[in-house]
Swiss-Prot record:
Disulfide bonds join 26-53, 33-47, 37-54. This is Beta-defensin 122. The gene is DEFB122. One of its GO terms (cellular component) is extracellular region. Residues 1-19 form the signal peptide. Its main location: secreted.
Length: 69
């Protein structure tokens, strides 16, 4: 039982360390939260942290076009 608990503790510590250095993701993990978007990215929504959710054009949702009546 002791080796199991030690292994579990090491794995939990490993996952916490790697999560700190990762970039915050948004829009179903398709976008990245940044202060400024890259040249080929566009802003679609805001992240929970207040940063911009930057999406590449291929990952942006297709919005319906308004039709004139």
């Amino acid at each position: 039982m002791k080796p199991f608990l030690v292994t579990l503790a090491v794995l939990l510590l490993f996952f916490q360390v790697t999560a700190v250095g990762s970039i915050e993701k948004c829009w179903n993990f398709r976008g990245s939260c940044r202060d400024e978007c890259l040249k080929n990215e566009k802003v679609y929504v805001f992240c929970m942290s207040g940063k911009l959710c930057c999406l590449k054009p291929k990952d942006q949702p297709h919005l319906p076009q308004r039709t004139k009546n």
